[in-house]
């Protein structure tokens, strides 16, 4: 018997790992995956369309999904035949670097709203269906910073520690229902994610930050981390292989 095609919902597909993974699954030679590639802003879907090539509209469908909105998540899941999500890939997220006293509470809460609460909202919507069907796979893009902290990544690292604790706890329940939960913990990845990170760091208001901290941030952290990204950075495609 032929294996049933699995419905895969991927979040954060406008660039980086989400885009690479959606394309890789959609172009699977055995056509085992129907991919619902989602993003918050459909105007950013050009790169995905281009790379999906012939798989577009056959094995890959692009949908609008904002992980910070329950309504948006529900609409997206309701638009999938029988609401059947066999594999959920939670990938939407962004980083934040800099001295913690220079971050606004609004930007800190926005990061958690996406990186952590976004995952929680998706689970609330999709997990009960998976439990009913007694099958499913949840793949969560975490980070090596969900395992250990890093200078000037306090808030981002905290959001990933939250993701890790949530998933480790949920996995214990999921096992009883035949559902797998996988945490992927990449190190540095060279992508749009990293480019945006440095761009935003450059525009931080650092006027209230002491000289010593600024010195560590600019002359040590930024200089060093750029080198690390360049020397050790993986491509999004390499990370997609793991999935």
Task: Please give the residue ranges for each predicted region.
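C-terminal beta-strand-loop-alpha-helix "lid" module of Rossmann-like NAD(P)-dependent dehydrogenases
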Residues: 177-229
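Residue(s) in the substrate-gating loop at a strand-loop-helix junction
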Residues: 143
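Conserved Rossmann-fold cofactor-binding substructure of NAD(P)-dependent oxidoreductases
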Residues: 68-83
């Amino acid at each position: 018997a032929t294996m049933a095609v699995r419905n895969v919902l991927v979040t954060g597909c406008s660039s980086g790992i989400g885009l690479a993974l959606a394309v890789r699954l959609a172009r699977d030679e055995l056509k085992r995956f129907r991919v619902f590639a989602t993003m918050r802003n459909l105007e950013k879907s050009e790169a995905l369309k281009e790379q999906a090539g012939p798989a577009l509209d056959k094995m890959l469908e692009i949908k609008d999904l904002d992980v910070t909105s329950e309504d948006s998540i529900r609409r997206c899941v309701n638009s999938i035949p029988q609401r059947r999500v066999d594999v959920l890939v939670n990938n939407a997220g962004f980083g934040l670097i800099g001295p913690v006293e220079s971050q606004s509470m609004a930007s800190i809460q926005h990061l958690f709203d996406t990186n952590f609460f976004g995952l929680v909202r998706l689970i609330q919507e999709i997990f009960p269906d998976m439990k009913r069907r007694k099958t499913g796979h949840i793949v969560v893009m975490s980070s090596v910073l969900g395992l250990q902290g890093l200078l000037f990544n306090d808030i981002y690292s905290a959001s990933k520690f939250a993701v890790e604790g949530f998933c480790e706890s949920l996995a214990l329940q999921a096992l009883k229902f035949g559902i797998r939960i996988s945490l992927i913990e990449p190190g540095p990845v060279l992508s749009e994610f990293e480019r945006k990170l440095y761009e935003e760091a450059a525009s931080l208001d650092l006027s209230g930050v002491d000289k010593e901290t600024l010195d560590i941030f600019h002359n040590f952290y930024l200089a060093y981390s750029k080198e690390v990204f360049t020397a050790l950075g993986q491509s999004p495609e390499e990370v997609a292989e793991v999935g």
